[in-house]
């Protein structure tokens, strides 16, 4: 597949799963079972997630995405019970596309911002 076709697969994945909250076609888009589970678990924990694709770049089989997102913690997430607290954060992700499906992934969220916002960790102010 071309870089543009790979970008289209990743854009569709992000738009359908994280923006439209519809994972009914996830098996068409993702061959990696871990990513399918993580994506569906994330949407269940944060069902009102709002996500904006800020940048989408592709070279060969690799597609890079930069997003901004906000959501309310309404379901269990990584063992943390719902807090009802809202967070805003950014993420960058790299996806490998093989045979028209996402086969591997590397995602970097601003986990500290998210965990502080939902109350999973205490905010620590820098010492002076």
What is the predicted role of each segment?
Residues 1-128:
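C-terminal and inter-domain tail/linker signature
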């Amino acid at each position: 597949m071309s870089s543009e076709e790979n970008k289209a697969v990743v854009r569709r994945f992000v738009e359908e799963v994280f923006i439209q909250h519809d994972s009914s076609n996830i098996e068409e888009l993702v061959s990696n079972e871990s990513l399918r589970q993580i994506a569906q678990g994330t949407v269940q924990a944060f069902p009102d997630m709002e996500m904006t694709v800020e940048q989408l770049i592709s070279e060969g089989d690799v597609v890079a995405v930069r997003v901004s997102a906000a959501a309310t913690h309404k379901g269990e997430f990584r063992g943390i019970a719902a807090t009802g607290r809202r967070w805003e954060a950014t993420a960058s992700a790299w996806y490998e596309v093989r045979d028209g499906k996402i086969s591997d992934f590397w995602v970097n969220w601003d986990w500290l911002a998210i965990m502080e916002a939902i109350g999973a960790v205490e905010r620590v102010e820098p010492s002076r």
